């Protein structure tokens, strides 16, 4: 309360003093002089105190920035409530790329101001293209918006405290005051100099209010403003480009875009040099006019060289003093700028015409390193030609080097494939492999290239984090695994475990995946192609069973029985079938160790429903079931035939017994005997046509061995 009263009384005292001083000023000059002196002294004291406080703040900022601690960064970062952008975030990375392109476009638009001056050859005066100056100013203002947005983003972009970098990535400073101090002490001045609308002010404000020789000097000022404003703009592009390549690794996503970007930089330099050539051509002609005016008797008025309706005219003597179409180097040597004056581009208001002509001049001389330039003795003209030659050499070598780098990145895989193919051919020739093996090797390499494009998928996936690798494998394999009916009953966790351990494999046509009697080391899930499986029941004579496998089928189920058996030995199971690829096959392989791990870790794999699914889709169980049904059918047919023959024999015996008392067989006995003999012959023919050579009666037919029953019961 006392503080408020004191403050209120002070305000009243100051007000009353001010009122009394006004009265004294109206009556006494001495008091006025004293009050003025006191006012000046108070202002100087305030300025001195403000200067001391600002210098103290700057020193405090330097000390605080150097000693910015980890605890302060954490506390300020947690306490901040405003939106602070992460310099490593995706938004700023995209914005930096956009801003780099905007800076390059802005640099390409600034030379448009050089096309504003034009020459009126009829009046021999210097004029201005009104349409061009408005267009250049509008385009320049549009690109300046990106600079303003970049400045705003810089005040909202955090930074990593230098003292916190020992803690991994470091702590992001989110204090708005510290961010502003850091930006004001680094790139703020450069950004402000780059965004100042100085060319627009010269074109739209200064030049319209000046006439005569002053306007010529103003055009020179425009030239120097645009030229020197190039410095902060170019200085700002390079660190931004380094920042973009440091955070994201690349500026363009594709090699062709990178090559086009470097070509654009070369063409941009051609455009800039062409614009300077246009402006310097006008400068040289105006210099010739001024010298002619000074030599004229009497000397002409220099303001007549400016195209003004009130003063223009009377410059016909310049046609003889500064000849263009029939140049005279004795009077004035235009040097490399004579072509621009003779072509009429400095007089034309057709912007596309003079733009493309000047662009072609810049591109031609950059590419030829300035060898065709015939300069005069004017020193700045020689410097301009030397700069063109050096810039052309540097830019052309830079363009060729970067284009070669970008284009080589597109053919690296092809070159690697050619080298591998050449090495394979040399190795096959050295080992004297037969032609059929060579064809199979070439076919496999070609098919592998078509499927993978030379990318080592396993190595690529192994370098990724586990969760990302699981998601990628799930995206690639899950939809294909669900085509296998056996996996439809499994839950998500088990499918993720299987997807993580599946390995893509490729097989060419007529290649053997596994042979009967070989150990089975992997379970194969077919995704594309067609296979043939054959079994001979252990090499049994006369036994052959074949099946076709396609997309969604699997083979190597013996490995699943081995993996589910907790008491199985380390020896791998033996394959009961031969599997051969009939065409190019793409599949996923599950190795024995991986299947054993999944079976031991996930007890939900043990279920009766999975047992029935396994039996239904297993080729081994299908073959055994078919052989079992065939054997049962043969037993049934044989039993039925025996019963039929026995019945016929009984009828014959009955007929013979009834006629035993007679001397000759009756007609009925004869019919029964002939029918019995016919049935016997028919049976013999049937059995002979079905089985050749005929097996002895004492050897029963061998059945296919029943597959081992997988242990789907969990051991609790």
Swiss-Prot record:
Tissue: Expressed in the whole plant but only weakly in roots.
Cytoplasmic compartment residues: 1-97, 154-187, 242-259, 401-716
Species in which this protein is naturally found: Arabidopsis thaliana (Mouse-ear cress)
Listed InterPro entries: cNMP-bd_dom (IPR000595), cNMP-bd_dom_sf (IPR018490), Ion_trans_dom (IPR005821), RmlC-like_jellyroll (IPR014710)
SMART domains listed in its UniProt record: cNMP
Domain of life: Eukaryota
UniProt region (Calmodulin-binding), positions on chain: 602-617
Binding, a nucleoside 3',5'-cyclic phosphate: 486-610
Annotated family: Belongs to the cyclic nucleotide-gated cation channel (TC 1.A.1.5) family.
Domain notes: The binding of calmodulin to the C-terminus might interfere with cyclic nucleotide binding and thus channel activation.
UniProt cross-references to PROSITE patterns, sorted A to Z: CNMP_BINDING_3
Predominant location category: membrane
Keyword Aminoacyl-tRNA synthetase assigned: no
Subcellular location: Cell membrane
Membrane topology, as annotated: Multi-pass membrane protein
Protein name: Cyclic nucleotide-gated ion channel 1
One Pfam family in the UniProt entry: Ion_trans
Phenotype seen when the gene is deleted: Plants exhibit an improved tolerance to Pb(2+).
Residue ranges, annotated region (Disordered): 689-716
Domain IQ: 622-651
Complexes and interactors: Homotetramer or heterotetramer (Potential). Binds calmodulin-2/3/5 with a higher affinity than calmodulin-1/4.
Regions crossing the membrane: 98-118, 133-153, 188-208, 221-241, 260-280, 380-400
Presence of keyword Nucleotide-binding: yes
């Amino acid at each position: 309360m006392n503080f408020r009263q004191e403050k209120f009384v002070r305000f009243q005292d100051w007000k009353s003093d001010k009122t009394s001083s006004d009265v004294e000023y109206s009556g006494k000059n001495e008091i006025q002089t004293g009050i003025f002196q006191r006012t000046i002294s108070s202002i100087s004291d305030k300025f001195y105190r403000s200067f001391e406080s600002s210098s103290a703040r700057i020193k405090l900022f330097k000390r605080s920035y150097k000693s910015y601690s980890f605890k302060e960064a954490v506390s300020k970062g947690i306490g901040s409530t405003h939106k602070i952008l992460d310099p490593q975030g995706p938004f700023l990375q995209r914005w930096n790329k956009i801003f780099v392109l905007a800076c390059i476009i802005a640099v390409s638009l600034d030379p448009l101001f050089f096309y504003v001056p034009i020459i009126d050859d009829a009046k021999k005066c210097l004029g201005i293209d009104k349409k061009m100056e408005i267009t250049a100013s509008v385009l320049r203002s549009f690109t300046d918006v990106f600079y303003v947005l970049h400045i705003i983003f810089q005040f909202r972009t955090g930074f990593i405290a230098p003292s916190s970098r020992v803690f991994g990535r470091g702590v992001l400073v989110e204090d708005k005051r510290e961010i502003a101090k850091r930006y004001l002490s680094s790139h703020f001045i450069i950004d402000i100099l780059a965004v100042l609308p100085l060319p627009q002010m010269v074109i739209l404000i200064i030049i319209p209010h000046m006439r005569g020789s002053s306007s010529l000097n103003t055009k020179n000022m425009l030239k120097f403003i645009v030229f020197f404003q190039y410095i902060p703009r170019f200085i700002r592009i390079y660190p931004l480009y380094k920042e973009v390549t440091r955070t994201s690794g690349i500026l363009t996503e594709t090699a062709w875009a990178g090559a086009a970007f470097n070509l654009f930089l070369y063409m941009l330099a051609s455009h800039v040099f062409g614009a300077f050539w246009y402006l310097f051509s006008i400068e040289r002609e105006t210099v010739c006019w001024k010298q002619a005016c000074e030599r004229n008797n009497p000397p002409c008025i220099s303001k007549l060289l400016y195209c003004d309706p009130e003063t223009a005219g009377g410059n016909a003597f310049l046609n003889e003093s500064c000849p263009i179409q029939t140049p005279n180097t004795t009077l004035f040597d235009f040097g490399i700028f004579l072509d621009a004056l003779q072509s009429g581009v400095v007089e034309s208001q057709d912007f596309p015409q003079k733009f493309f002509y000047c662009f072609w001049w810049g591109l031609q001389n950059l590419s030829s390193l300035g060898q065709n330039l015939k300069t005069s003795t004017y020193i700045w003209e020689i410097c301009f030609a030397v700069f063109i030659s050096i810039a052309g050499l540097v830019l052309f070598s830079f363009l060729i080097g970067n284009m070669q780098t970008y284009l080589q990145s597109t053919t690296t895989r092809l070159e690697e494939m050619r080298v591998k193919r050449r090495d394979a051919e040399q190795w096959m020739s050295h080992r004297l492999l037969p032609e059929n093996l060579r064809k199979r090797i070439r076919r496999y390499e070609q098919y592998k290239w078509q499927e993978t494009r030379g990318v080592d998928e396993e190595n690529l996936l192994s370098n990724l984090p586990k969760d990302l690798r699981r998601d990628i494998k799930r995206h690639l394999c899950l939809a294909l695994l669900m085509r296998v009916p056996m996996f439809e009953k499994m839950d998500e966790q088990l499918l993720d475990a299987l997807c993580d351990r599946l390995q893509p494999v490729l097989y060419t046509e007529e290649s053997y995946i596994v042979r009967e009697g070989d150990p089975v080391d992997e379970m194969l899930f077919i995704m594309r192609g067609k296979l043939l499986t054959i079994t001979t029941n252990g090499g049994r004579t006369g036994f052959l069973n074949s099946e076709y496998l396609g997309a969604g089928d699997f083979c190597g189920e013996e490995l699943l029985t081995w993996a589910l058996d907790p008491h199985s030995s380390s020896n791998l199971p033996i394959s009961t079938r031969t599997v051969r690829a009939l065409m190019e096959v793409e599949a996923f392989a599950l190795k024995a160790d991986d299947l054993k791990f999944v079976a031991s870790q996930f007890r939900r794999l043990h279920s009766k429903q999975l047992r029935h699914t396994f039996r239904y889709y297993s080729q081994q169980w299908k073959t055994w079931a078919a052989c079992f049904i065939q054997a049962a059918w043969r037993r049934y047919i044989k039993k039925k035939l025996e019963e039929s023959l026995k019945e016929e024999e009984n009828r014959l015996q009955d007929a013979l017994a009834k006629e035993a008392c007679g001397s000759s067989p009756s007609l009925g006995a004869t019919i029964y005997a002939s029918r019995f003999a016919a049935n016997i012959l028919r049976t013999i023919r049937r059995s002979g046509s079905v089985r050749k050579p005929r097996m002895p009666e004492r050897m029963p037919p061998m059945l296919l061995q029943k597959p081992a029953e997988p242990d789907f019961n969990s051991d609790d």
